[in-house]
Amino acid sequence: LDVLKQSTSKLLSNDALELSIMITDNYGLDSNYIAMAWFSKADLYIEQLQFDKAFSLFDSIRINYPFHSLSDEILYKRARAMELQGKWQSALDFYSDIVKFYGTDILADNALFKSAEILETKLNQTEKALDTYKKLLTEHPGSLYIYETRKRVRRLRGEEIEKEDE
């Protein structure tokens, strides 16, 4: 994965970093890697837009490994799958569960940012989006999304954004 992380392709590099973090966060916590294998297969199904198959595998993980550390990643992947299908409220529900049950985990700030983005750009609920962005700023000050979040808050407030900030 280190070679992929150094790739010049931003998307490939970001995907490699995301995968590396997910593996580091969940690998080796138990000696049974079946849940990780099922998760990987479900992730592939999402990429192939085979959502029912993916969700079936996610359900199998939840049933067979109810306290596995992949639980927050499963919610995140479900939310992303809902976004791919244009099911914005369902995506928001999954993101909300991440914040509610895994608020201090690595995906909490991602879930808040994605929620605010959906509220702002897909559902045109600017006040709720603004509140969600503010929550991200206060609860996750070290987030990688801080710079973009500040820009969006200023824009939603109607403040002037300098050219270099765009």
Question: What are the residue ranges of the model-derived segments?
Answer:
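Acidic, polar-rich low-complexity tracts and alpha-helical solenoid repeat scaffolds
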Residues: L1-E166
